[in-house]
Amino acid sequence: MKMTSKKMKDELMKKLSRPEWDFHYDSEKEVLRIEQKDSKKGINVSLPGVVAKWEVNKEKAIEEVAYYVQEALIAMHKEENSAAKILPVIRSTSFPKQAEEGNPFIMTDHTAETRIYYALDSNKTYRLIDERLLKKLGLTEQQVREMALFNARSLGYEFKQDTVAGNTFYFLNTNDGYDATRILNESLLQSMREKISGDMVVAVPHQDVLIIADIVNEIGYDIIAQMTMKFFAEGHVPITSLSFVYEDGDFEPIFILAKNRKKTDGKEKG
């Protein structure tokens, strides 16, 4: 059998077939590229050189090249994961619960409107952690949650401030993909609670904004409702159009409070 670059390409693709790797063949340059689907990092193999080795060593030449490529790609993946951070992200409760059939994401309940997912972030790539990835990382769900919350506390914050009709609104919008995640930083929420004189209202209309408001009158509630709806409609990754009253570590959706107010008002009038 005469070995050609095209035949060698087919042989290597058979040896290196893995669901997390992609192949790209440049027939003009006779180069086969094998790369990781997530990071796009990979190895280029010049096929004429492998064919020349095959003429001398036959199958052993293919085995050696396949081994080299496999080890290099696995090393790249380990290096990438060791540099990666696990961070929590806030999503709507309507967000998919599975990456695909039979492969659920790692999740934690948060509020009636929001759920916590976990992202493996290496700056260049960002992937929500599902059960299969969890196994590859060699971590438990509890370890992922603890690491994520620890890293969330290290995220910086600097608010812009605006006052309307006596109500003060604080906006966080760094566009780092984790603005809404700051809602999980309990020490941040407590420090804001101390400086707020009225009701503390918190909103995460989309991934790239956190709003904390000091609401002292009904106008303030109207403003935060309109503001949250506007941000929700404009967000690249919308979360919820509802805002929450924050008290003693709990988030109460405002529409529930409004319903309770109406019931109370009705009883008083009766």
From Swiss-Prot:
Domain of life: Bacteria
Any Pfam family hit: DUF1444
Signal peptide region: none
Family as reported in the entry's similarity comment: Belongs to the UPF0354 family.
HAMAP family (UniProt xref): UPF0354
Listed NCBIfam families: PRK13668.1
Record-given protein name: UPF0354 protein BCAH820_4810
Natural source organism: Bacillus cereus (strain AH820)
